[in-house]
Regions:
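Internal, well-folded beta-alpha domain core
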Residues: 65-229
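Active-site helix-to-loop segments that bind/position phosphate- or nucleotide-bearing substrates
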Residues: 1-67
Length: 229
């Protein structure tokens, strides 16, 4: 989706600095640096990195793609896809540039709606085709909002979607989602699957990412719950 990514960024860069900073919810401290970095997107000498190394959030820290072997990278290229509001859907090896963006951003000269809406028709058939080619099951480890990039009901009709949830048991016995732990577990789970070449659901359930353990009592066929504590 390189052509679409260029169109998105060309439209983004027509916005003023303050308008762009507001859309991206940048703090005053980050406004100048963040918008300046985006404005280098089309510079010919800008550094590009593989997508799995370009992002620095907690999920990607725990994925730890910098420690992948050549065989890990090859397997990940066949089995892992990364969502992006600028690039759409990425292979972990695809070289990209800095692309901080929000799905709710509206770019009237590109599309009559949000970036979420812009991408749905592009990405839905592609994701379905990729999942079917890889065996027909999607283990969804992205954040919940990323469903908005797709016609999600159509995806769920076409392929088997499994969504893990990671919950921490409180002293009261209640289960609670803690966002940073969820991000850590998602990245660790993806990394373990890649390094161990795991393709069976039973093997996925047996994983204990960041200490979270699969709980049959709290899970259904497609909504899996992993519990810590």
């Amino acid at each position: 989706f390189a052509q679409e990514a260029r169109a998105v960024m060309a439209s983004v860069l027509r916005l003023g600095r303050d308008e762009l900073a507001t859309m991206l919810q940048l703090s005053p401290k980050l406004r100048d640096e963040g918008t300046a970095r985006l404005r280098t997107f089309f510079d010919p000498d800008v550094t590009e990195l593989p997508a799995a190394l370009s992002y620095t959030g907690m999920v990607f820290r725990k994925l730890s793609a910098s420690t992948f072997t050549a065989e890990d990278w090859a397997w990940a290229a066949e089995h892992l896809r990364i969502t992006s509001f600028v690039y759409g859907l990425l292979s972990p090896q695809t070289a990209i540039r800095y692309d901080r963006m929000e799905g709710a951003v509206q770019l009237p000269d590109l599309y009559d709606g949000r970036l979420f809406d812009y991408w749905r028709d592009h990405l839905t058939p592609y994701l379905i085709e990729e999942v079917q080619r890889a065996g027909g099951t999607l283990l969804f480890l992205a954040s919940d909002e990323m469903r908005g990039l797709f016609h999600w009901a159509e995806v769920e009709r076409a392929v088997r979607v499994i969504t893990p949830t990671f919950l921490v048991r409180q002293p009261t016995g209640k289960l609670k989602q803690i966002v940073v732990y969820t991000k850590m577990a998602r990245g660790a789970m993806a990394g373990a699957i890649i390094r161990q070449r795991l393709e069976e659901e039973e093997a996925w359930r047996a994983l204990t990412p960041e200490g979270f353990v699969f709980s049959p009592e709290e899970s259904s066929d497609r909504d899996w719950t992993f519990v810590l504590g």
